[in-house]
């Protein structure tokens, strides 16, 4: 098949009609592990923040702890943009092997850091791998999961970030306990966890096929049909389906080898500008909200509640549990009640709860335990909200630019909300001012409420709809 041929394909509709199966669980586990790895890395950065200020480790200042977190996020931005374009150009499968390899190398090297600059560079490399993973994996998962359950599955996968967070927190209880492992050595062992998990992920991904939707667009529809036929046979056996192909929706496209930059620009800035604004706001607000608290929670507990650094990890466990349960228990509502209503509710409620908690903190009415309980309740809601931001940007743009769109809005949101937040809050905590920290929490809360208002205004009701119905492929124009 040559570039520019017009074809009609049942591939998207056949993927969407498949019943849930063990094959889909393989997709979820092997690709969704990205969020576990990111949760692990962010948690280690938070838990190690206090330890790395000690003279027998790297002797960092609180500001440099925040700066190292910023380097991780900046690396994630560059990785997302670079690998996001590569994912749309060269395929989902090629890139999700490259990105996890970059992550593995970065996190392994982090264990051998000898000063601030080496640590910052290795954290940036680790972030580049994770950022690339977000673009490659989000696009692949959405294109392989049936439309009727895409919302709950995406939220569940994004929520697994907190499985990694819990794993990191539990590990630090042992690795940062000087009675078990010397302080100068324990933090280095912590980074070995991520490298080990990365090797396991590479092993499982060997069985994941290229996205049939990507193959279809790039003139390889015969390969796409073969993959879908194999999956159908694996899942359905000889039973077949109750619906014949002739009754399914046909996707009509003109094949292409790549999407030019001017077409990417036109689609994002002009054709889908309202959706672009929505994605920008949702990603920015949740990134600031999360990173403001998560990259600095260890410093808050140690400075304002006098929690010993080796005990910080234990305070994260209930926090992580609330974050895991939120998407698990609320996820199905995004497919039944609908995207627009649920995103509006979760964003708005998360902002209101943080403002109330900040007021209690400012009034001196919280202890380390009640502060953690409040965070747990807030992020039960906020975790579903943040996960829905990734769900939104991964499904409301055309197939040809899906990974790039994810990368762009992840990058914008992370730069504006994620990179700035740790620096700002690290500096605030360094001043020791409770009032300044309270005002920072109010800013984060206001941003989440802004996200809720924006979703209510221009949100896209994408629940239970094929990706091709939510956003028609660019290659279908004029057909």
Feature map (PLM): residue ranges:
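Transmembrane-helix signature of 12-pass secondary carriers
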Residues: 1-479
